[in-house]
Amino acid sequence: MCDGALLPPLVLPVLLLLVWGLDPGTAVGDAAADVEVVLPWRVRPDDVHLPPLPAAPGPRRRRRPRTPPAAPRARPGERALLLHLPAFGRDLYLQLRRDLRFLSRGFEVEEAGAARRRGRPAELCFYSGRVLGHPGSLVSLSACGAAGGLVGLIQLGQEQVLIQPLNNSQGPFSGREHLIRRKWSLTPSPSAEAQRPEQLCKVLTEKKKPTWGRPSRDWRERRNAIRLTSEHTVETLVVADADMVQYHGAEAAQRFILTVMNMVYNMFQHQSLGIKINIQVTKLVLLRQRPAKLSIGHHGERSLESFCHWQNEEYGGARYLGNNQVPGGKDDPPLVDAAVFVTRTDFCVHKDEPCDTVGIAYLGGVCSAKRKCVLAEDNGLNLAFTIAHELGHNLGMNHDDDHSSCAGRSHIMSGEWVKGRNPSDLSWSSCSRDDLENFLKSKVSTCLLVTDPRSQHTVRLPHKLPGMHYSANEQCQILFGMNATFCRNMEHLMCAGLWCLVEGDTSCKTKLDPPLDGTECGADKWCRAGECVSKTPIPEHVDGDWSPWGAWSMCSRTCGTGARFRQRKCDNPPPGPGGTHCPGASVEHAVCENLPCPKGLPSFRDQQCQAHDRLSPKKKGLLTAVVVDDKPCELYCSPLGKESPLLVADRVLDGTPCGPYETDLCVHGKCQKIGCDGIIGSAAKEDRCGVCSGDGKTCHLVKGDFSHARGTALKDSGKGSINSDWKIELPGEFQIAGTTVRYVRRGLWEKISAKGPTKLPLHLMVLLFHDQDYGIHYEYTVPVNRTAENQSEPEKPQDSLFIWTHSGWEGCSVQCGGGERRTIVSCTRIVNKTTTLVNDSDCPQASRPEPQVRRCNLHPCQSRWVAGPWSPCSATCEKGFQHREVTCVYQLQNGTHVATRPLYCPGPRPAAVQSCEGQDCLSIWEASEWSQCSASCGKGVWKRTVACTNSQGKCDASTRPRAEEACEDYSGCYEWKTGDWSTCSSTCGKGLQSRVVQCMHKVTGRHGSECPALSKPAPYRQCYQEVCNDRINANTITSPRLAALTYKCTRDQWTVYCRVIREKNLCQDMRWYQRCCQTCRDFYANKMRQPPPNS
């Protein structure tokens, strides 16, 4: 849907339905079309004769075809057909095979009335194939219905042939008259920018109560992460409301909805989404009447809730039982992941009255029994954009405006989504992609991982824009009914908004919706994204490929084992129209090693709880980490002295161990297996001898049982011990005999384990309490050159060779900025090509090599010096000192800063102490009175003088009073405005002139009464003309009121009676003069021009 992209291949049933409603006498769209009446015949392979292809002839009229010899009779539902079709001077041979890949076996169109009644299942009457002798050709036909005629599309390159039976013909399609039309495909162009509509969407969220106490363990959940697959299928139920079915008609509504859902399918195939989402319709329900349990009205939320309950009762059912899919028998209802209800009822958000809302959905409701619903208003083919937007909410996508990084841009999930673009022009934002990935990684999306095995998806059809299938007239009929046509006098504006004329109306009307992309708007032009642009070729098929991996991120930890990641983008090149998305993952994680953490440092999980505790306004130091077994990568913290953990974060930081004694790490919220080779997901394990991926032959296992113990204690010869001196230790880890010993106690059961190797002899002691004992089972290993613990060294056999080897690498000396790793030099014994690590004393010290050195952690440091604010000067007058805190900190992935060693920070340490000079005592500022506001009409400033009274001018600048301040004054905004003087009220002698005098605001132009009355200009003045005839008294028309009427006179009000008024000499009466001002004014003028009578 972004610029230059195209629609993916259309699904077969949509193309078939596009031609069912054509009038035989009407061409499709505005493209040139030929019409013929032909007789298709079924033939045998021996009857096929492929002559050379002639050039395409010009337009033709109807002709009657010849009748070929007898052929096999076609029977509906056959698997394969070979048809002969004489068309436009050519013999076309159609090789067809029955094709049901676009439907699930359980798909059906159901018409439901007052009593629920299922329609018959779809017939096995859909065929697809090719035209023999025409490489790249495509045929999609149906032979459905009682009449059994052929309906569908034949495509030969850029030429399309539409076929349907004549209305007056009956019988099987073989040998039956059919009407064919030929049109030439047009090439699409890159889209232009579109306009934003003001249409509203409402997303409903589920309110969750906070969980206290230990979280419950859902038996359906597993520790292993749900891996993000490259393809997911949303099996969708679509229900058409009764008012929509009545408006369009059942057949047209079926065609319309399938076309819309195909557009929705194409939008979710767009490369910008990054994940292939198949929106597949499993059932279409056409309501003849609304069921009693389904309440649809103006209140949007109530309508959506009612539909959700109704669809769950009618078409719901358990999709999963634990982690097992419910088997699908032939009588089972089709699986439903989402449900869409389309209505022509105008609904609204939060109120029970019509408004501009066009869609409502539950956020993240897919797969939920009573939240997987979308409510959409039928507003023409733009319904596709509404459904795509709301299904995005259903799949966990928020509005782009909810993300600061995506706000203010034009994408499908914009708060006011862009209308006027089609699926080839609209794209998904990176925030929508991230929201979708997070939703699909959650366990609530598991229904999308299993698709109805009866479903088939693909069919190879050419890319077409929707406006190439619906002409402007047909789009008007969808919006305003079958009596509507396109307004030709609005053709110059048609791409900005589709204007239609309904039969019987005198003016055109519009819903401000642009026509579909591909609608012709002139010679070699069509509408794209709301503009009329030239046609350009369709881009070629291009599969996406990955860009090179980016640089590794910083390690998530400053000490110990952590995780880092790197990213790549599918833009080298990006997937083109119909192209596939890049296979594999866009993010890769790896283990990173740092220097061991200092002793006494809290665990990484505890540090995260403490960081949250520091940010909390409550008392500090109260939270400690708790690992929940079935949710190891969620951060639970427990208040001190309480056993109820609190969920603090949905996931811990990358590199957090999954448990206190585990090597597996949490990465992106999922517990990942870490092999002994340090690779995420590796299956490498240490053998019993502690060798990674070893065969267990380098050591000898010693084990046995001892049955005289009640409690156990462990002690080395260096006096380190556990449970000694009659003291019982808490479970944990202890450093004894040069190794880490782990002690676990559960009730009376105890376990002591250590990885080794030990450097001192260990003594296992038994503490005897009471009389009952439970026994001890022990196991330990010794190198093959030793037989038992504390046994003296055996003599070295003559065939043994002891040499120094580099057995491994130490950790990096620094965590960033470039450090060194050194090899571990070990003594190795070689016997019969078998190597074994032995004590260093077995090898000669004189030949011990120097360790090898390698550079490591070359990435820049994220550690930096952080300096706090300076303290106040130690002296209030004269010289003193200031102090501040300077710390070396490291930034974690979540933005939290933790203190680290000063050697990790680059550059010199900022100064922590500096000299300062206190302000001289008794230094004060002096300010004068405020001046008048600098503006008399609007905003201005007050000003005053501010001076330092100290002789040296060392007043504290931070306490200096303001010298300017904003002010507003509107006292001088009104003034007198005058109009032009009118013509003189008299044509002779003395008269009056008038003008308009008004008090108006300088800025707004509004009338007011604040102007000074003394300065008001005169509204009247005297004027003088030539001397008048004495017979007419000039004063009768020179009064101010009569002059004003004369000035304002435009025409007579009583045209019929004004001649009588003049003859009866009634013009001097102001009441009659006002109604016949033009006649009376001319009467006086003529009187003044007449000469006086002879005396």
From Swiss-Prot:
Domain (PLAC): residue spans on this chain: 1045-1084
The protein's Enzyme Commission number: 3.4.24.-
Compartment(s): Secreted, Extracellular space, Extracellular matrix
UniProt organism field: Homo sapiens
Molecular function terms, GO-annotated: metal ion binding; metalloendopeptidase activity
Gene: ADAMTS17
Residues that bind Zn(2+): C201, H389, H393, H399
Domain characteristics, as noted in the entry: The conserved cysteine present in the cysteine-switch motif binds the catalytic zinc ion, thus inhibiting the enzyme. The dissociation of the cysteine from the zinc ion upon the activation-peptide release activates the enzyme.
Keywords: Cleavage on pair of basic residues, Deafness, Disulfide bond, Dwarfism, Extracellular matrix, Glycoprotein, Hydrolase, Metal-binding, Metalloprotease, Protease, Repeat, Secreted, Signal, Zinc, Zymogen
Region of interest called Spacer, as start-end residue ranges on this chain: 702-779
Residue span, TSP type-1 domain: 543-598, 800-860, 861-922, 925-968, 972-1029
Renumbered ranges of motif Cysteine switch: 199-206
InterPro entries linked to this entry: ADAM_Cys-rich, ADAMTS/ADAMTS-like, ADAMTS17/19_C, ADAMTS_ADAMTS-like, ADAMTS_CR_2, ADAMTS_CR_3, ADAMTS_spacer1, MetalloPept_cat_dom_sf
Name of the molecule in the record: A disintegrin and metalloproteinase with thrombospondin motifs 17
Residue positions of the active site: E390
Tissue and organ expression note: Isoform 1 and isoform 2 are expressed at high levels in the lung, brain, whole eye and retina. Isoform 1 shows a weaker expression in the heart, kidney and skeletal muscle. Isoform 2 shows a weaker expression in the kidney, bone marrow and skeletal muscle. Isoform 1 and isoform 2 are expressed at high levels in the fetal heart, kidney, and whole eye, whereas a weak expression is seen in the fetal liver.
Signal peptide: 1-27
GO biological process: extracellular matrix organization; proteolysis
Gene Ontology CC terms: extracellular matrix; extracellular region
Peptidase M12B domain segment(s): 232-452
SUPFAM superfamilies tied to this protein: Metalloproteases ('zincins'), catalytic domain (SSF55486), TSP-1 type 1 repeat (SSF82895)
